[in-house]
């Protein structure tokens, strides 16, 4: 038996058509297979129609590929109006003969259809439109409506299969939508739609905690590879945006340039400041001074004529301006100079994927050299651990990709003593961790600061007193006379104990 030459295998590989949908081509590793059909399945409101329209719109706008939209549900006028909400001028594309909307919606009078079911007429209309407009892409919305109009499921299945076979014969790339009942139940309502399609994509809109979370999953991509699992997505003002975190690569450059924290003593503790492209986390109980450190970080950027952006999820803009004034920081002047942008929003105002999209959009437009989020813990309220972890990875990955220094805060639940920073999924992602906490010394409450971690650099290991004054933060000497500060039960070291420790240290040194 003879095998074809190795070069023939390349020719036989499935070619892919880019959809142009942000993130989706990363998930399917290049796009949808050319000349094949893809089933877009989801419950009501998951974005199936938007996906199919986005597929056609991008084909026309970015790849000069005319498209045909076959509607079995909405009228062409409703489709044009709904698309306009995403900034898509489909009417202009229709007038330019780049897009044709074929209306196959049911008779509004609800008249019964007599005789046997046959799609021959519709198939010929689609075939004619494809030839006339030289279409490369076809979207059918939705085949569920066809099943609902006729009782003979096996006959409808046969006709749908005949339609898809004809489209495949013509060579167009087709997406068609179908409705399912449950988010994690059968793929399609009638249980046959997925068998007549080459590829299956599932859209979900699941209630997690108190919020809805949209995800996309490629269940089947026949003859080619794709990323596995669910990936979050959002529907914004420009359509669908998918966040394929699995496609992120650790290929960003690493800078040796340092930037100041805005607090000279803290810079000394960090070996000369933070790295330019590092992610810094300040974690501690409420009131320990996390927002103050963020403010000084932002102020230092603006003082050096660099742009900075602050995303605040716990305080209003007025509160931030007032608090900044009490520390001698004029945020309002920085805004007027065009060096600072402040975005304030309630975490519950939208989903995490939407917050991530807003962050990426604002950073892309403002182009800052530093960013800050105050705080991550506020965004974690009411969402699953997995959703929050993906959000943090998305934000930090984007910041590193853009070579932006990021300063985030996290509020710990414990008011006194040590607290875990691993439960928030961010301890291993961040480059520098500043731990702030309350300590009781001689019957008075004091604040302590420690550089808990600093990747790739020497840093001070001491636990130092952190004081907030009208002129900002002051970092004083370490609590050298105390131990067990981190545990929350500081113990004063006596003179005898200090002498003994010094003697032991000298003994170890002499043995070396």
UniProtKB/Swiss-Prot annotation:
ATP 1 binds at residues 45-49, 85, 220-222, 224, 226. Its cofactor is Mg(2+). Phosphorylated on serine and threonine residues by autocatalysis. Has a 4 step phosphorylation cycle; the autokinase acts first on Thr-428, then Ser-427. When Ser-427 is modified KaiC switches to an autophosphatase mode, acting first on phospho-Thr-428 then phospho-Ser-427. ATP 2 binds at residues 286-292, 327, 447, 453-455, 457, 459, 461. The keyword Hydrolase applies. The modification Phosphothreonine is found at residue 428. The modification Phosphoserine is found at residue 427. It catalyses: L-seryl-[protein] + ATP = O-phospho-L-seryl-[protein] + ADP + H(+); L-threonyl-[protein] + ATP = O-phospho-L-threonyl-[protein] + ADP + H(+); ATP + H2O = ADP + phosphate + H(+). Its EC number is 2.7.11.1, 3.6.4.-. Mg(2+) 2 binds at residues 291, 314. GO terms for biological process: circadian rhythm; regulation of circadian rhythm; regulation of DNA-templated transcription. Mg(2+) 1 binds at residue 49. InterPro entries: Circadian_clock_KaiC-rel (IPR051347), Circadian_KaiC_bact (IPR013503), KaiC (IPR030665), KaiC-like_dom (IPR014774), KaiC_C (IPR047222), KaiC_dom (IPR010624), KaiC_N (IPR047221), P-loop_NTPase (IPR027417). In the homohexamer the 2 domains (called CI and CII) self-associate to each form a 'donut' layer; the compactness and local conformation of the domains varies over the cell cycle and impacts function. CII has the autokinase and autophosphatase activities, both CI and CII have (weak) ATPase activity; CI has the clock pacemaker role. Belongs to the KaiC family. This is Circadian clock oscillator protein KaiC.
């Amino acid at each position: 038996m003879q095998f074809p030459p190795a070069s023939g295998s390349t020719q036989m590989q499935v070619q892919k058509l880019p959809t142009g949908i942000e993130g989706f081509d990363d998930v399917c590793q290049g796009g949808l297979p050319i000349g094949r059909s893809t089933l877009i399945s989801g419950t009501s409101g998951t974005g199936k129609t938007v996906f199919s329209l986005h597929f056609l719109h991008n084909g026309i706008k970015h790849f000069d590929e005319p498209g045909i939209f076959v509607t079995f549900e909405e009228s062409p006028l409703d489709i044009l109006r709904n698309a306009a909400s995403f900034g898509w001028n489909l009417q202009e594309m229709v007038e330019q003969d780049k897009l044709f909307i074929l209306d196959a919606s049911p008779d509004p009078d609800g008249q019964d259809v007599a005789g046997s079911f046959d799609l021959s007429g519709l198939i010929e209309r689609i075939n004619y439109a494809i030839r006339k407009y030289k279409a490369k892409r076809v979207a059918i919305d939705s085949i569920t409506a066809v099943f609902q109009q006729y009782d003979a499921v096996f006959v409808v299945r046969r006709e749908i299969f005949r339609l898809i076979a004809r489209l495949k014969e013509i060579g167009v790339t087709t997406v068609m939508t179908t409705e399912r009942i449950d988010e994690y139940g059968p793929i399609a309502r009638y249980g046959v739609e997925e068998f007549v399609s080459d590829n299956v994509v599932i859209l979900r809109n699941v209630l997690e905690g108190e919020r809805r979370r949209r995800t996309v999953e490629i269940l089947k991509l026949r003859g080619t590879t794709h990323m596995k699992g669910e990936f979050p997505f959002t529907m914004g003002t420009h359509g669908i945006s998918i966040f394929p975190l699995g496609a992120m690569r650790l290929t960003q450059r690493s800078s040796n340039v340092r930037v100041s924290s805005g607090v000279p003593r803290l810079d000394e503790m960090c070996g000369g400041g933070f790295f330019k492209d590092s992610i810094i986390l300040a974690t501690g109980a409420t009131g320990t001074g996390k927002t103050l450190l963020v403010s000084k970080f932002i102020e230092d950027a603006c003082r050096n004529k660099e742009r900075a952006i602050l995303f605040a999820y716990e305080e209003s803009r007025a509160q931030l301006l007032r608090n900044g004034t009490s520390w001698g920081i004029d945020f309002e002047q920085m805004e007027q100079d065009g060096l600072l942008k402040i975005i304030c929003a309630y975490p519950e105002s939208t989903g995490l994927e939407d917050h991530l999209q807003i962050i990426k959009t604002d950073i892309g437009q403002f182009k800052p050299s530093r960013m800050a989020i105050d705080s991550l813990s506020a965004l974690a309220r009411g969402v699953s651990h997995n959703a929050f972890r993906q959000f943090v990875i998305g934000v930090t990955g984007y910041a590193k990709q853009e070579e932006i220094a990021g300063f985030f805060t996290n509020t710990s639940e414990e008011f006194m003593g040590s607290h875990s920073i691993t439960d928030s999924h961010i301890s291993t992602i961040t480059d520098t961790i500043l731990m702030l906490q309350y300590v009781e010394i001689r019957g008075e409450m004091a604040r302590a600061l420690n550089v808990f971690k600093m990747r790739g650099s020497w840093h001070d290991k001491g636990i130092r007193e952190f004081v907030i004054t009208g002129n900002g933060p002051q970092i004083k000497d370490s609590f050298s006379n105390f131990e067990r500060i981190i545990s929350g039960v500081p113990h004063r070291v006596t003179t005898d104990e200090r002498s003994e420790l010094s003697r032991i240290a000298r003994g170890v040194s002499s043995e070396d």
